[in-house]
């Protein structure tokens, strides 16, 4: 778990902001949301496959738009 030591004469809000930033970088909130409810293995595979298709479509659409410009 990330920890933050409050420096001398440092306001609590600044330390809290640093802690939030560290947690965000570590991905703790995303992990918590993901584990909030049980996800069946088949549902997880479906979700990951759909994300891969979406990524691939986005990647190919970017390539197509880059090649279209002939000016």
UniProtKB/Swiss-Prot annotation:
Quote the InterPro entries the UniProt record gives.
Ribosomal_bS21 (IPR001911), Ribosomal_bS21_CS (IPR018278), Ribosomal_bS21_sf (IPR038380)
Extract one GO molecular function annotation from the record.
structural constituent of ribosome
Feature: compositional bias, Basic residues: 45-71
Start and end residues of each stretch annotated as Disordered: 39-71
GO CC terms on record?
ribonucleoprotein complex; ribosome
Keywords, sorted A to Z: Ribonucleoprotein, Ribosomal protein
Say yes or no: keyword Ribonucleoprotein present: yes
GO BP term (any one): translation
Entry's PANTHER family? MITOCHONDRIAL 28S RIBOSOMAL PROTEIN S21 (PTHR21109), SMALL RIBOSOMAL SUBUNIT PROTEIN BS21 (PTHR21109:SF22)
The protein's matches in NCBIfam families, at most eight in alphabetical order, are given as: S21p
Q: Which family does it belong to?
A: Belongs to the bacterial ribosomal protein bS21 family.
Name of the protein in question = Small ribosomal subunit protein bS21
Q: What is the source species?
A: Xylella fastidiosa (strain M12)
Tell me the gene name. rpsU
């Amino acid at each position: 778990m990330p920890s933050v030591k409050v420096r001398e004469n440092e306001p609590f809000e600044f330390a809290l902001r640093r802690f939030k930033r560290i947690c965000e970088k570590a991905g703790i909130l995303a992990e918590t949301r993901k584990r909030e409810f049980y996800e069946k293995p088949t549902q997880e595979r479906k979700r990951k496959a759909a994300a891969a298709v979406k990524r691939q479509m986005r990647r190919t659409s970017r390539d197509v738009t880059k090649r279209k410009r002939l000016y």
